[in-house]
Amino acid sequence: MSDQNEVLFEIKREHLNTGLRGFPVGTCRTSSVDPLEGLHYVGYPIADLADLDPEAAAYLLLYKALPDADQLAAFKAELIKRSAVNPVVINTLKALPKEGHPMEWLIAGLNLLGMTSKTGSFEEDGLNVIARMPEVVAAIYRIRSGWGEPIASKPEL
């Protein structure tokens, strides 16, 4: 077992001007970037994950393993159960200025989801956001485009 207080390297003021290039400033089990191999999620090259179902990619990021068929089906079913968006979110989005940038709308949508469905559990809140974002994004698009009232999602499709 390694000593948690062991000094691994020394950073000098001159290193700060390079953006700490070459010095690890944190570790993460979820993703890594290698200058030669590129971006990896949980050890998988990102190109190998490009054709996954979105739910399979979300499962990988949450649980650090690719789901088998049964796990993926159960995960999709769980997201469907959680997919209902509080009407307060949609009504508040409808009141936003149309001139706002789409990313500002997305930030507002995420904030509204957090304010209307907080459970106190990081995992539960994350699953709720994943399940509800498709409807929020679709509502933002309809509202900003002037296509009328947002249409309730059909997550089972």
Regions found by a protein language model. Give the residues of each.
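Hydrophobic alpha-helical bundle cores within soluble ligand-binding/oligomerization subdomains
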Residues: 1-157
